[in-house]
Structures are given as structure tokens and as C-alpha cells.
Design a protein with these regions (language model features):
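Solvent-exposed, low-complexity segments and loops of surface/extracellular structural proteins
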Residues: 1-213
Length: 213
């Protein structure tokens, strides 16, 4: 079955959703090699693929949609920027980046998805009631806050090294800092950016885990 897929140049749609049927054997690991591509359509992978090794090389790579609904482990490598506008994974996926390039995932991570960032700038969005650890690693990362994490199930947000920014609406920030719960669930975030700063709210920075900008 298909075990390696390379995409370069400008494209629209790549459907590898039947790769497990190409031969009798079924591949559960796929190497997706991106080499300076801009894809405006969906890149759809077989649900039998449980481990996706995604390498971003040559130049910046952008996928409008990556559908890897079977993937429980997604490993991002490479030295070029990667943009995933919409990424659909297994609901309990573990995404690990060791990339030195910037990694941007525009769509919100599902509540049960864990994320570990690399040395580059990670730009991600969480969702409310996240049950897993989200850590962006080194670099000046940006996390858009989707809502309170579930601390009962070890949900957390860790900005890691660098000067890291959390983006919230004013209402989210006011609610989050009204108690000490938010501060207990986040760490290593240095900058609070309000996406709607004109909206007047009272924010208690003493409950913001030391965020000071």
C-alpha cells in the first residue's frame, strides 16, 4: 500500500483515501513530503494511516485542508514554514513538531488532541474543554484561546521558551481571570493580546499566571 506521498508546486485536491486498497497489505504509516506546495483543495489520507510523518521542505508549504481522520500520531519535521488552514485528525491524536520552521494550524485543535511544538514559531488555536496538554515549545509562539481547559483530565497550555502570546477576546479574558483556575492551567505565557480590545471588560491580571504584557 501507499507509504510515501510527495507533493510540490501548486495543486488543488489530492485524494489518497483509498491507498489501503492499492495492494493486499495495508500501510499504517505514511510519509507526506511537502516540497514548496500551495494546495487550495483537500489532501485526504486513508483512514488506515495511524502515523503521519509530515515533512515541510524546500519552501513554505500551505495546505487548505488536511484530512487524516485515522491518524493518532502526527509528526511534523522540516525547516520550512507549514500552514494547515484546516486539519482534521483522529479525535485523540498526538501532534509533535520537531520542525525548525514555523507551524501554523488555523483550525482549532480538537478537545482530545495533544500538541507539542518545536523550535519554530507555533501558531495554534485551542478549543473549550481541552483534555490534553498543549505545549508550543521554543520560539515566540501564539495560542488563540478557545475556552477553559479541563484540568480534571490534565488539560493545560504551556507556552514553553520564548516570548509567547495568548490571544483572547476581552470577555474570555475577564471570565478566565475572575478566578485562579485559569492561572493553574497555563504556564510560560508572557503576552495577553485582546482580539477585540475596544470591548470594555475588567481583567484581573493577578489571576493571569504572571502574564505581564
Amino acid at each position: 500500500a501507499l507509504s510515501s506521498l510527495t507533493i510540490d508546486g501548486t495543486g488543488s485536491t489530492v485524494n489518497a483515501g483509498t491507498s489501503g486498497l492499492l495492494t493486499t497489505a495495508t500501510a499504517t504509516t505514511l510519509a507526506l513530503n511537502l516540497k514548496g506546495t500551495t494546495s487550495t483543495g483537500a489532501v485526504t489520507l486513508d483512514a488506515d494511516v495511524k502515523t503521519l510523518n509530515l515533512d515541510s521542505a524546500t519552501a513554505k508549504n500551505t495546505l487548505a485542508t488536511l484530512s487524516a481522520t485515522g491518524a493518532t500520531a502526527i509528526n511534523i519535521t522540516g525547516d520550512q514554514a507549514l500552514v494547515l488552514t484546516t486539519a482534521t485528525t483522529n479525535a485523540a491524536a498526538v501532534i509533535t513538531s520537531t520542525s525548525t520552521g514555523a507551524v501554523t494550524i488555523t483550525s482549532a485543535l480538537q478537545a482530545g488532541v495533544a500538541y507539542t511544538g518545536g523550535a519554530g514559531v507555533d501558531t495554534i488555536k485551542t478549543t473549550t474543554a481541552s483534555t490534553k496538554a498543549v505545549s508550543t515549545g521554543a520560539g515566540d509562539d501564539v495560542v488563540t484561546y478557545g475556552g477553559p481547559v479541563s484540568t480534571v483530565t490534565a488539560g493545560s497550555i504551556d507556552g514553553g521558551a520564548g516570548t509567547d502570546t495568548i490571544v483572547m477576546t476581552a470577555a474570555q479574558a475577564a471570565t478566565a481571570t475572575a478566578t485562579a483556575t485559569f492561572a493553574a492551567s497555563v504556564s510560560n505565557l508572557e503576552v495577553l493580546k485582546l482580539s477585540d480590545a475596544a470591548n470594555s471588560q475588567t481583567i484581573n491580571m493577578t489571576n493571569a499566571d504572571g502574564i505581564n504584557h
